[in-house]
Amino acid sequence: MEPRLLMLGFLSLTIVPSCRAELCLYDPPEVPNATFKALSYKNGTILNCECKRGFRRLKELVYMRCLGNSWSSNCQCTSNSHDKSRKQVTAQLEHQKEQQTTTDMQKPTQSMHQENLTGHCREPPPWKHEDSKRIYHFVEGQSVHYECIPGYKALQRGPAISICKMKCGKTGWTQPQLTCVDEREHHRFLASEESQGSRNSSPESETSCPITTTDFPQPTETTAMTETFVLTMEYKVAVASCLFLLISILLLSGLTWQHRWRKSRRTI
């Protein structure tokens, strides 16, 4: 019995740290009149299982994680109400709104094609009674692509991409080189943008770590608290599990040794 317990404790201590991925502390930067989307998701990416109003997620399915080329689990939402008829009517109305919202969100990103790379996951399929907004926790190396919303055109001198990178010991997103302006005033902004581009053509230096960083936007308190909570809770549970296993192993070893010692004394 002891060798099996020792092996279980050893596996727990070695597997838990190996699953760790460096999460991006903040959300990707927002660009006015533009939306961003990931073409694929790197290993370790976490998606919260959020449910719309009137529904709640199952306790054992708090989030789903990208592992290999697929997501670790499927989110599920259950109703808070026991009224069957009211639940059906509400679900139908919410489903119609959800379909419209999903269609509107997909319009500006129709020209984007999802990558099919090893170690990446595609966009997770929607689950029943899902919230209209998805909350992702990206990992280092993740890139997101930006596009202007309908009615706006892009003014850019560089790629409309933001990448989560490690800089000076902290993770942060690069600033996308994209400005979205009204289609009716696009020609005016284009002329002024060309004149400014000739004056401000010096590339940014990425070799040194300045004291005050301007590349990465400051997060809101709510975003920081949410992402820190997911990260700390996950590792607190892992550490507590390892400690529990170690204590159990020590107790079982002590009891076994005591039993053998008493048995040996009786034989003497």
UniProtKB/Swiss-Prot annotation:
Chain ranges on the Extracellular side, renumbered to this chain: 22-236
GO function term, MF aspect, one: interleukin-2 binding
Pfam families: Sushi
Transmembrane stretches, start-end: 237-257
SMART domains: CCP (SM00032)
Topology, Cytoplasmic side: 258-268
Chief location of this protein within or outside the cell: membrane
Classification via CDD domains: CCP (cd00033)
Protein name, as recorded: Interleukin-2 receptor subunit alpha
Organism, scientific name: Mus musculus (Mouse)
Protein's gene: Il2ra
